[in-house]
Amino acid sequence: MLSTDILERKPRLRAIAALVPEDCQCLADIGTDHGYLPAALLRAGRCRRAIAADIGAAPLERARQTARLYGLEDRMELRLGG
């Protein structure tokens, strides 16, 4: 079970997070938008690091804000591109 509140109101993302193995070394979230999925998994200790990618600069900026909010800048790599 995910021990974080980030996904509390996001049932679709909770379902995806449940499929990630406990010993995930690196998660790639393509189309990350706000970066909630990688942030939740990093905070819960389910993944060591994550790559959050999006084709839009605005969504990636939201992911950057999420990473900053939770102090994950050193473990959540952000990539812009398609």
Which positions does each model-derived feature cover?
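S-adenosyl-L-methionine
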Residues: 1-25, 39, 64-82
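Conserved SAM-binding loop of SAM-dependent methyltransferases across substrates and taxa
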Residues: 34-47
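Conserved SAM/SAH-binding beta-strand->alpha-helix loop
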Residues: 56-58
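Conserved SAM-binding motif I beta-strand of class I
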Residues: 49-54
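Conserved class I S-adenosyl-L-methionine
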Residues: 24-33
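A structural micro-motif
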Residues: 25, 45-48, 74-76
